[in-house]
Each structure stands twice: as C-alpha cells, then as structure tokens.
C-alpha cells in the first residue's frame, strides 16, 4: 500500500475506550456498537460479547480488557476504522483500565441514569484526565422507568464540570443514541499521531499464551509499520524474534498483511518462553530500531497476599506453570514459592484486591483444573525492631519474636463511599466497627452523600463491601486507594491443634479483636474437624499466652456393654484401660485438618 494511502487511512482511525463504574452498562453498550456497525453477525451475537471468559458472563462483570476493530460509515458516507477497548469497572482491575487508556486518544464515560455518579466513575474520570484523553460523557439506561436524567445531568455538571448539553442520552439495551455516540467519536476524538516513515515502535498493552502460536502480544503501533517476516526486538531485554503473524480482532483474530501507525492489533512471533514478554514493553524493528522506549506503565504493587497450596503435592509444577501463564495475561499478579509445615510446597501470591484474589483462584480451578487450598489473606506490615531495623512482613510465618518489636505499621486506605443520605448513620456505624476514621462528608446533591474514610486495609478484606451493600440495600458504591502506613497495636495470633501450631492458620490481628476473633475461629473449627478417638484441644495463642481454648470431644466406645451385673471392679478395670489407651493416642495421634476448615477460617470476621 502506498504511503499516501496509509496517511489517509491514519486520519480516519479513532482509538477509544469505554469506562464506567461496575454495572453501569459498558459491556451492553459495547454489544450494541458491535451490532449497529455489523461487526458481529446477528446469528453470532450474544450478551457481553467481548467478555470472553465464562467467569465474566456468570458474574456479569468485565475482568479483562478486550480490543476490537470496527468499521463505521458516518452520516457523510466516509469510512472510519475504530478500535474499541472495553475495560473493567471494578476498582481491583484499575490497572487493566490504565493500560487500555495508554492505547487510546479518547474515552466514552458511561453513567447509569438510575444510579448517577458513583465512586469508580470519579476514579476513571480522573484517570482519563491524567492521560490527556478527550471525554465523551454518556448517560445510559434511559429506557428504565426509574431513570432520572435531569438529576444525573446536574451531578455531571456539579461534580465533573461538564455542561449538560454535552452529554449523550443512550440505551445500551435498545440501541437508542448509539449512532450519535459513534458520530461524536468521529468528530471529537482526534486521529492518532505518528509517522509511517519513522522506525517501527509499538507498546505491548496486553498478552496471552496460545498453545499453537506461543505468546501473543496486543499492541498499539505508535510509528512505522510491521509485517510478517520482520525481525523485532523487545527493548527491555533486547530479545529478537521473527514475526510469524500480525492482525486485528474484528471481533475474532483476523490476520493482516501488516499493521501501521495508529492501529491496535496483535502480534505473534512463536515465542514459547513466557518470561520474555512484559506488558508495557516497547517493540521495535531489529534492523531499523527506534532510539527511545515508550513510557510504558508504572510497576503496580500488590496489596493483598495469600498462600496457595495444591491439594496433591504432585500438582506443584502444574500450579507453577498455571501461575506463569496467568501472569502473562495479568501483569499485576505476583508469586513466589513458600513452604508450610501443614500444607507442604506452595506459593505466596500478591493481588490488587480481594475480588482479584477470588478471580485468580477461580481461573486456576477452571482453566487449569487444579484444586488448591487458600490461606487467609494478609497485607504487607512494616515491623520496626528495637535495633532500628525495618522488616517487611507479608506472611504471618515471617513475624519476628515479640520481644524484639518496637512498633508495627500497617497500610491504611483512603475510601470514597457514595450512598443515599438516609444511610449515612448505618454506614458510619459499620465503618467504625472496622476501625475506620472519618475524614469528610459532602453532598453531590440533597439526597446523595460522599463520605471519605481512612481504614486499615486488613479490615476491609473481611466482608466490608458485602456488609456495606447490605446495610444500604445495595445503593452504596465503594472505591479506595492506598494512603499511607500508620502505627497500630498488632499481634500474631496462632491456632494450636492438639498442642501443635498450624502455621497456615496463623493471622496478624489488632489486639482489641484477638479474643472475639479467636472465639469465632474455635467455634468454626469444632464444626469442621471430625471427632477423633481422643479429645482434641483447640487453642488460640498470642505468643505463649493462650487466650481461648475449646475441646473437640472424643468418640467413646461402650467397653462395658457386655458386662451384665457382676463385680463393679471388672467395669472399672475396662474403663481404666480405655482411659490409658486414649491418653496414649492423644500423645501419638495426629489430627488431619480438612480443606473445609481453611475455608471456614476465611469466612470468619
């Protein structure tokens, strides 16, 4: 293709993302765009088309960003190439959103007409501003009977500073207003910059492993062009490969002769070593390289950690391989090997939040058919010793001896809660029970309040969001960011079973909650652990001090059932013999902890 034709095509490219709070209708709107532009045949169309995982469809949420090329003819009859990137809405997947925005020039900000601006709406709005993207505000779900368009328009003006006449009214369900959005994309979002004559330069914004093609990278081309047979170089590690295929998603993988400046597509180079490809890396032409790398992405730090152990030891290598493949597809995931006395070999895994943790566990089970035991989630604590050294603790097993600790700091988050004004009291009661510190209350309008709280991250890990939804009848939205580390009265709490510490059940806890949590854990374990032939004590200890003890009663065989009357000394002898046997069993016996016991601990508060 001649350079002049490519330049003309480049002027007709539009790259944009759809961003919104979770459940505001992003994926449904994306479905209507695909349908109206005939990108997907009607016989193939299904709900949440771009959500490729079964898990996404079941939960009704987007977990992974997805890119698709659309051909749109505007009202003048001119043809435009659009690259739509659908993004997640949950706070745990903000990293996915930031990666998608780096490949775009504009965004469609979707706001639910029934719920208005919510916490993640604000986060995504500011994320788009940070990336200097043009924002097209859209009010969705206008077909619902409880839609309040005027109220939402006022919120948009007061909170985001966008004039009401600049918003587009849309129904992702019926398709009303969708063509108007696409016309706005054409007229308002600029075409991508870059020069076809410059050396090839592209950003890897996602990747996944294909069993036949090896590592497939999703790229945005910022200059030059790439085609099959070209030699490419990854600029972070200088690895060189030959391109075996390039193409776009429209919406399925469609090979093309080449990708040129401004396009969003995929690149395969028969890369089998997963470690060689990094999200955020710059790819260039090996023979005619670009001089500098693209900014890429800041490395994101995990905030929640847990241990993951295969139920059978033989699955350890399989679990390791599964985690490597998931990390390729999810750059925010971290893991390292660890060993537990109770559970054997496993991994310490870092996540961006509890939903992220839950999703990864589900994917390991479904996609790789691996059954695994999960330990209680933890965060990174800063432990300062009396000698002045600082120890980072992400696992209770690394907790130092109490005698050498001077102070402990834990991560606090800044949480934004948006809810109807009538629920402020119940939200504050719940938040204070989680050691929350109120910072500010403001009002988006006379009925909607925005509450700012500081929480210890460890406290919101246990059912806070579920309880928040419950006390506000589902109307509250919650979003958070890591704030700072603060001093806290924290202790390591051990669980002993028959006198032995079960290291996988140890947790770090605030001293004010140790006794109550210990009582709950003991009760749960009594329900889960089957009775033995001997009495099994369950103890909760802080250091060497036992603060809670419960016993699992032993099973009892009626050894005197065959004694009919006669001398009582015969019965005493049999009972004494049984007692000695049980004492010996207690000293030698081992109690096997079932998997449901670990799950029960996770469900406690």
UniProtKB/Swiss-Prot annotation:
Keywords: Cell membrane, GTP-binding, Hydrolase, Membrane, Nucleotide-binding, Protein biosynthesis. InterPro entries: EF-4, EFG_III/V, EFG_V-like, EFTu-like_2, G_TR_CS, LepA_C_sf, LepA_CTD, LepA_IV. It catalyses: GTP + H2O = GDP + phosphate + H(+). It is an enzyme of class 3 (hydrolase). Its main location: membrane. Signal peptide: none annotated. GO terms for biological process: positive regulation of translation. Required for accurate and efficient protein synthesis under certain stress conditions. May act as a fidelity factor of the translation reaction, by catalyzing a one-codon backward translocation of tRNAs on improperly translocated ribosomes. Back-translocation proceeds from a post-translocation (POST) complex to a pre-translocation (PRE) complex, thus giving elongation factor G a second chance to translocate the tRNAs correctly. Binds to ribosomes in a GTP-dependent manner. This is Elongation factor 4.
